């Protein structure tokens, strides 16, 4: 510890004052190295007097007149004056002088070889401060030489806890700017600047007669790019390409993948990109050569621009480096700047899927149509939903407007209109029978005879494709067993009739004023629905989701205690979509609904001892972003109808207009009511006054009529789950090249009991020094085929001397908890490039 320097001094001084004869000891500390420490020196038989340049006469008088018996250490924090200027010269002649060489003391105390004492002496100004000296000690360096001493000094000035040049550079880059950097100013203050540039040369191959921090960082970014861009570098960049690419790649990967410093990396990347005129040079390269480059956000901008061009031309077969557009989108999202372009890549991926699959081909037979929609075609609605979900996150959508128009045209004209017409024609041919359970039979089929407590969550306008996303989320939960099916909804497909159909009943009917009645009773409020439910299930309850959100556990549990059936009414999608001001937020509402329902199920299961849930809806919806022109609306419905909406009309007579279909209320409800329900054949709307025109329901389409039913059972006991593991496939025991690729495999597919995770994979020495770049692996593959879960990683090793007799390891750490999950011993058999001149 630093205190040992003072102990050595104290011991020496105490030995001087050990005799009974009075002694005066003068200590001229030329560099004021011990000015901060002098008062902490504990002398056993003497006192300390502070000598200043202007109090020499007083000190002389004090020592020779006022106190002539006490031993004194006279400390002067300056060099000994010449005899002419030293008024204590005659006193010193009969006293003793003390000399403390801090460099010698430090060298001795730290166990530094005597040959490195000049290094300590060169930087002795650094050690004049007690706090700096202590921090130097705290680094606990084992082997001292010029390099380790200088790096340690820099580490202290950068406030680093370990002596590492990589950490020094990391602090310099992340804690201040590239111009007028405060740490470089500190280095200059203590004469460390040339040492810093020497270290930059040794570690990263940066050597410049007029070095600057900006040029060092340009060297690192250009060298990194040169190893991932598969073409010749621009002439202007070539002087910045370093042969120490392994060290540079390792440092850059660690910095960009750091949770703490990733954002600062992004800022530096932008500065360098502009400084080297990156946009101009990269635009001239073939885009295929840029696919693996991930240290400039500008690369993603160019790739996105290329994908946009392909999709605008509906070129769904386009590939880069053998990768399809969806594969590129997935891969680039996982790269460092993927988080910055997450929305853009999701937009493009969903646009691709829409272009590839959105051109609907009619299906014969309503049962075939139902099967195809519930198994695959629903995904087209999902592609559209997620396209706009991410599109709406962009601040500037200009670049994507042509694709948006293409997606809108395909969805509206080549998919939605076609499938709706196909649906209505096939449904009419089948006399309105899809073969599915009718929504009005829901209670009788699924609730009435349930032996355990069941919670029915009715989410207003939760259409089938949105429910399927929720189902997939439930399925991925190891504590949930979920299945999904569809019911045939009612016409009109709107809230009053849909909610009534889910209640137990003997009859459902319209009053003369077109109110929906269940067993002759109103059913529009929660209280009215609960009264009806209790007539069939005494131990039952109806509650609104919003009233439960902030409940404490005891209050939540009380809702379910003693109940056989609980209906929970959730309204997120319809509440947002039915208002003109917020209808374009409906896809955001869908995501929120999924999360709210999932969280509700988990919460009720864990806090209220209830484990069986059924999620369903009153109806679905149709949503189109572009507003319908007035000329495209079906006129005449409002004047002839007693009850009318944009997608339905109920009246005593048919609406005589092209593109309008009809059925009777009696057919829908199983009664003798002959009133006519009219609805558009395609996805258009009636010309009526009312709310928005983008979000509509009430008509007859798969999106409106196929009501989802998710059956969820939550396990009381937790299943044993594990994280997806990775293993080394390559039979490698020796590394012979600075660039090495290895094959790995994700050992099991992600499932309900095997959860996805991410790993950091790199090489280390026996002393835990990181010797390669760091690869981030996201273990999220679900393929059953093992070969499809294999992947290859590239490692760039530091260009340094490796000892073949020492142990080195390939290691993998779980990125979430920093637990080591893989350690594979290897031999490093690489000839040192600097020795043999392999790289010029």
Give the label of every model feature segment.
Residues 460:
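Ligand-binding pocket scaffold of soluble enzyme catalytic domains
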Residues 1-453, 463-613, 617-840:
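…; additionally, a secondary subgroup of soluble metalloenzymes is captured
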């Amino acid at each position: 510890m630093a205190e040992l320097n003072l102990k050595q001094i104290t011991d020496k001084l105490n030995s001087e004052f050990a005799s009974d004869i009075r002694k005066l000891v003068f200590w001229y500390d030329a560099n004021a190295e011990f000015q901060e420490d002098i008062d902490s020196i504990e002398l056993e038989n003497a006192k300390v007097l502070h000598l200043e340049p202007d109090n020499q006469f007083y000190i002389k008088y004090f020592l020779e007149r006022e106190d002539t018996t006490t031993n004194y250490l006279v400390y002067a924090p300056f060099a000994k004056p010449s005899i002419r200027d030293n008024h204590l010269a005659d006193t010193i002649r009969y006293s003793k002088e003390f000399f403390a060489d801090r460099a010698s003391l430090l060298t001795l105390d730290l166990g530094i070889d005597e040959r490195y004492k000049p290094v300590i002496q060169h930087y002795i100004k650094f050690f004049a401060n007690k706090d700096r000296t202590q921090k130097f000690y705290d680094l606990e360096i084992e082997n001292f030489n010029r390099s380790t001493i200088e790096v340690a000094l820099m580490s202290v000035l950068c406030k680093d806890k370990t002596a590492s040049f990589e950490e020094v550079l990391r602090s310099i880059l992340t804690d201040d700017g590239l111009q007028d950097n405060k740490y470089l100013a500190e280095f200059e203050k203590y004469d460390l600047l040339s040492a810093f540039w020497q270290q930059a040369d040794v570690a990263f191959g940066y050597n410049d007669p007029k070095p600057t921090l900006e040029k060092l960082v340009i060297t690192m970014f250009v060298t990194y790019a040169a190893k991932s861009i598969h073409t010749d570098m621009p002439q202007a960049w070539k002087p910045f390409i370093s042969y120490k690419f392994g060290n540079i790649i390792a440092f850059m990967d660690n910095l960009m993948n750091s949770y703490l410093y990733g954002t600062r990396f992004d800022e530096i990347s932008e500065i360098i990109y502009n400084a080297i005129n990156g946009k101009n040079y990269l635009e001239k390269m073939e885009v295929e050569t840029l696919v693996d480059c991930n240290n400039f956000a500008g690369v993603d901008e160019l790739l996105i621009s290329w994908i946009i061009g392909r999709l605008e031309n509906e070129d769904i077969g386009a590939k880069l480096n053998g990768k399809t557009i969806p594969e590129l989108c997935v891969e680039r999202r996982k790269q460092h700047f993927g988080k910055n372009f997450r929305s853009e890549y999701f937009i493009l991926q969903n646009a691709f899927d829409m272009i590839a699959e959105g051109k609907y081909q009619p299906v014969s037979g309503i049962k075939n149509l139902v099967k195809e929609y519930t198994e695959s075609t629903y995904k087209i609605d999902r592609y559209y939903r997620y396209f706009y979900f991410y599109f709406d996150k962009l601040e500037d959508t200009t670049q994507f407007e042509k694709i948006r128009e293409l997606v809108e045209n395909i969805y509206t004209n080549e998919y939605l209109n076609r499938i709706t017409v196909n649906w209505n024609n096939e449904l009419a041919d089948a006399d309105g029978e899809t073969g599915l359970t009718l929504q009005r039979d829901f209670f009788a089929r699924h609730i009435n005879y349930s032996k355990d407590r069941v919670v029915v969550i009715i989410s207003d306008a939760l259409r089938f494709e949105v429910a399927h996303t929720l189902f997939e989320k439930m399925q991925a939960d190891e504590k949930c067993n979920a299945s999904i099916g569809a019911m045939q909804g009612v016409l009109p497909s709107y809230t009053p009739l849909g909610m009534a159909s889910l209640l137990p009943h003997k009859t459902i009917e319209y009053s003369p004023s077109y109110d929906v009645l269940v067993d002759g009773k109103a059913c529009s409020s929660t209280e009215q629905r609960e009264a009806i439910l209790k007539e069939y299930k005494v131990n039952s309850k109806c509650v609104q989701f919003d009233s439960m959100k902030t409940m404490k556990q005891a209050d939540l549990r009380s809702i379910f205690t003693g109940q056989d059936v609980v209906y929970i009414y959730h309204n997120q999608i319809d509440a947002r979509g039915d208002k003109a001001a917020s209808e374009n937020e409906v896809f955001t509402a869908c995501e929120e609904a999924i999360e709210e329902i999932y969280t509700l199920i988990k919460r009720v299961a864990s806090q209220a001892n209830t484990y069986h849930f059924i999620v369903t809806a009153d109806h679905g919806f149709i949503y189109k972003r572009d507003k319908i022109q007035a000329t495209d609306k079906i006129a005449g419905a409002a004047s002839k109808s007693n009850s009318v909406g944009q997608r339905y009309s109920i009246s005593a007579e048919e609406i005589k207009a092209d593109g309008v279909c009809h059925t009777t209320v009696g057919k829908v409800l199983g009664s003798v009511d002959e009133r006519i329900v009219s609805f558009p054949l395609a996805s258009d709307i009636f010309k009526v006054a009312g709310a928005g025109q983008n979000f509509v329901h009430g008509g007859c389409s798969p999106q409106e009529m196929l009501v989802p039913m998710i059956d969820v059972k939550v396990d009381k006991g937790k299943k044993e789950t594990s994280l997806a593991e990775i293993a080394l496939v390559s039979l490698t025991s020796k590394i012979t090249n600075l660039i090495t690729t290895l094959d790995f495999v994700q050992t099991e597919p992600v499932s309900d009991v095997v959860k996805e995770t991410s790993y950091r994979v790199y090489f280390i020495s026996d002393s835990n020094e990181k010797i390669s770049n760091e690869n981030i692996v996201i273990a999220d593959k679900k393929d059953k085929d093992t070969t499809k879960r294999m992947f290859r990683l590239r490692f760039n090793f530091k260009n340094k001397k490796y000892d073949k007799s020492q142990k080195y390891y390939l290691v993998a750490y779980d990125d979430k908890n920093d637990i080591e999950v893989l350690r594979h011993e290897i031999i490093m058999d690489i000839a040192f490039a600097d020795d043999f001149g392999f790289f010029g």
